[in-house]
Amino acid sequence: MTAILERRESTSLWGRFCNWITSTENRLYIGWFGVLMIPTLLTATSVFIIAFIAAPPVDIDGIREPVSGSLLYGNNIISGAIIPTSAAIGLHFYPIWEAASVDEWLYNGGPYELIVLHFLLGVACYMGREWELSFRLGMRPWIAVAYSAPVAAATAVFLIYPIGQGSFSDGMPLGISGTFNFMIVFQAEHNILMHPFHMLGVAGVFGGSLFSAMHGSLVTSSLIRETTENESANEGYKFGQEEETYNIVAAHGYFGRLIFQYASFNNSRSLHFFLAAWPVVGIWFTALGISTMAFNLNGFNFNQSVVDSQGRVINTWADIINRANLGMEVMHERNAHNFPLDLAALEVPSLNG
């Protein structure tokens, strides 16, 4: 009898833990995805802060020329970054215990791999946690689907691109100027501005901003008056009220006359689906573009595509971009390359005499 009671107590302890983890009554929902999300994101955040402040220079190119990225080694908030793992490590899994010492681990940029891998696992679990909470509350799953766009984008620049290029040293540095450097080098090597998927991403982000501003201003301009001139318009709404707080018919009429009738949504549900889907699909395409360019399926090349009747090149904007690309390419990692690939001759010129 004693053994049976102990087993029930043990089961009930596990049951209480499960109930607490999956309870929607907690101030912050944890969930089973949260069990993995919390330690991974805490680890990534803690190591990022410490490394951004105090990490020593990293031999990013594997040529014994360390690059400083932390505040204590001369950087500021703008120039500072977590320097990617060394090209000498490549794609190898490089935890602390694989290095001969902590100094070696820091010199080879071990913190970058640690932060990136924990971060990607953490944001993936955050997405799963969004789905899990929606499921518990009986909601539809589209919040997690929308969040998959930034998760895909982060995975593309921090994991897929390094895999395609053969080294974590090609991943995006974790800092402001490091991000810009990554963008410039990416343009030089892959001509991303001429890739259709990047164009769709630009349309998604800029279009999403435009539609968000249009929707917010239109709703704010068609609020149903509930207050006097001396009160804030926000006082006219009470959380949870049943009646609509703005006149969708008036908003529809205004916008239909401003543009044309069928440019204006007359269904609130389809409108909000569109507002969510437009930027999400655009960012999905950008992530796909990065993931294809990771394996060197690059943007369109229209260099020297227009010639006159004598065969002389008439430069287009594509040629101007190409010239800029060449300049950017020869300047990056300048001590690692003797002959940049794009500038190397296809065959050795013959010498007469």
UniProtKB/Swiss-Prot annotation:
Modified residues (N-acetylthreonine): 2
Main location: plastid
Binding of chlorophyll a PD1, residues: 198
Positions that bind chlorophyll a ChlzD1: 118
GO terms classed as biological process: photosynthetic electron transport in photosystem II; response to herbicide
Pfam families registered for this protein in UniProt: Photo_RC
Catalytic activity: 2 a plastoquinone + 4 hnu + 2 H2O = 2 a plastoquinol + O2
Record-marked site positions (Tyrosine radical intermediate): 161
Binding site for Fe cation: 215, 272
Binding site for [CaMn4O5] cluster: 170, 189, 332-333, 342, 344
SUPFAM superfamilies assigned: Bacterial photosystem II reaction centre, L and M subunits
Membrane topology: Multi-pass membrane protein
Binding of a quinone, residues: 215, 264-265
Modified positions (Phosphothreonine) in chain numbering: 2
Cofactor note: The D1/D2 heterodimer binds P680, chlorophylls that are the primary electron donor of PSII, and subsequent electron acceptors. It shares a non-heme iron and each subunit binds pheophytin, quinone, additional chlorophylls, carotenoids and lipids. D1 provides most of the ligands for the Mn4-Ca-O5 cluster of the oxygen-evolving complex (OEC). There is also a Cl(-1) ion associated with D1 and D2, which is required for oxygen evolution. The PSII complex binds additional chlorophylls, carotenoids and specific lipids.
Compartment list: Plastid, Chloroplast thylakoid membrane
TM regions (residue ranges): 29-46, 118-133, 142-156, 197-218, 274-288
Modifications after synthesis and translation: Tyr-161 forms a radical intermediate that is referred to as redox-active TyrZ, YZ or Y-Z. C-terminally processed by CTPA; processing is essential to allow assembly of the oxygen-evolving complex and thus photosynthetic growth.
Residue numbers covered by the propeptide annotation in the UniProt entry: 345-353
InterPro entries: D1/D2 (IPR055266), Photo_II_D1/D2_sf (IPR036854), Photo_RC_L/M (IPR000484), Photo_RC_L/M_CS (IPR055265), PSII_D1 (IPR005867)
E.C. numbers: 1.10.3.9
Family note: Belongs to the reaction center PufL/M/PsbA/D family.
Assembly information from the UniProt record: PSII is composed of 1 copy each of membrane proteins PsbA, PsbB, PsbC, PsbD, PsbE, PsbF, PsbH, PsbI, PsbJ, PsbK, PsbL, PsbM, PsbT, PsbX, PsbY, PsbZ, Psb30/Ycf12, at least 3 peripheral proteins of the oxygen-evolving complex and a large number of cofactors. It forms dimeric complexes.
Protein name, UniProt field: Photosystem II protein D1
